[in-house]
Amino acid sequence: MSVTKGLEGIVATSSSISSIIDDTLTYVGYDIDDLAENASFEEVIFLLWNLRLPNHLELEDLKNQLAANAALPNEIIEYFKMYPIEKVHPMGALRTAVSMLGLYDEEADVMDDQANLRKAIRLQAKIPAIVTAFSRIRKGLEPIAPRKDFGYAQNFLYMLNGNEPSQVEIEAFNKALVLHADHELNASTFTARVCVATLSDMYSGVTAAIGALKGPLHGGANEAVMKMLKEIDTLENVEAYINNKLDNKEKIMGFGHRVYRKGDPRAKHLREMSKRLTDMNGEPKWYEMSTKIEELVTSRKPLPPNVDFYSASVYHSLGIDHDLFTPIFAVSRMSGWIAHILEQYENNRLIRPRAEYVGPGMQKYVPIEER
């Protein structure tokens, strides 16, 4: 029996949602570069769920449905207020809150196609409110209700900080959402598909995916990148800090990727937004330090930056707390998780691999008195 640790290189299913071929990422055949430069996140949601881009009426209908379903049940807000959430990592709070949503959804266990689409809308609509409500309540602030005249990216930033974001900020966050929406069969997406392949409900599948994303080997890299940038603090300290890390064979977060060999195609878009945002905010050092780190690392190792590296300075420049970086990943990836859940339901087969047994050989039971 041949064992492939971590299932690396194993093709476990067929999918029409996204592909990574020769370091090119596509959603339903559309190059990520094309989508990042031109598409709204709402268009990408529709694309992933319907395998085609929407027309104008379909896009407006989706936006209206997301806006109409964006408010949280009061029970979740009260839960955040009662629980000592200052001691909880936001991913733990997000996992619990999404699971709670299922308790208040009368269609949670209704499995027909139309009910699943309605649940998809509710989940995608409410996850920004969960993250922003958590963020504000732990600071002693009241949650801010979403505005129906704002788009998805604009509403998130508004609910987080209470200020109307600038066009540059909206563009940057929309681009980040588009870039993180799906990524083929990553760990959290595979987890969601394994869960719903048992014919469990959508809330269970998404909750399982969030649990997988919570692990530091999947989510959290951009949070670690920002921690590194804060430790370095100045452009003058970069060279000594990075060379010391590399000399001691320590890992530099935000570089390299399990799938991409020549480079993550998403990184350049966030690099550009990092430059624009840090200049606009009068804090160019975060971009300058990042580019210097990239120069030093790539001069010594064949490891180009991945999507996490420049997203750190982008999110920081948008006024987002560092421990919210991974929950924001979930806000975007919710669209991809749902797309894969819907696809799994459509052509389902229980996912049940085998394991190579490496324990002791056959043994005879010994009564406890004789042990």
List where the protein language model places each region.
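Non-transmembrane, aqueous-exposed alpha-helical and coiled segments at domain scale
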Residues: M1-R371
